[in-house]
Amino acid sequence: MSQTYNVLIATELKGIGEDAEKEMAMRLEEHGFEKIPTLSSAWEIKCDAEGESEAKDQAIQIFVNVCRTYPFELRMVVHAGTSQIIRRKKSFEA
C-alpha cells in the first residue's frame, strides 16, 4: 500500500551561475519541490511510494532530471523517515 513521504534534500551546487540557479529553483518548484527557507539550499517534496527508499529514489530522480540541463557539480544528502541517509555527487556537462 502506497504512503506519502516527505523527502528532504540538502544540496551544495558547485560551479553554477546565479541566473541558472534561480531558473533551476523555479523549475524545481514547478515539479513539486518546496524550498526550505531556514537553509540556503534545502528542498522538500512529498512522494507517494511503497516505502522510504522508493520515495527517496523518486525525489532524487526528479531533482536530477531538473538539474541535468545545467553544467555544474551537484552534491546532495537525501533523507526520508527513519531509513538510511543517501549521499550522492553528480557532475553535469553542458
Give residue spans per PLM region.
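Short, flexible, solvent-exposed loop/turn segments with mixed acidic/basic and small polar residues
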Residues: M1-S2, G32-K35
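Short structural boundary motif marking the start of a folded domain
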Residues: Q3-V7
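Short, surface-exposed ligand-recognition loops at beta-strand->loop->(often short) alpha-helix junctions
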Residues: T11-D19
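Generic recognition of short, well-ordered alpha-helical segments
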Residues: D19-E23, Q58
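Short, intrinsically disordered low-complexity segments
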Residues: E34-Q84
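A mid-sequence interfacial segment
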Residues: Q84-A94
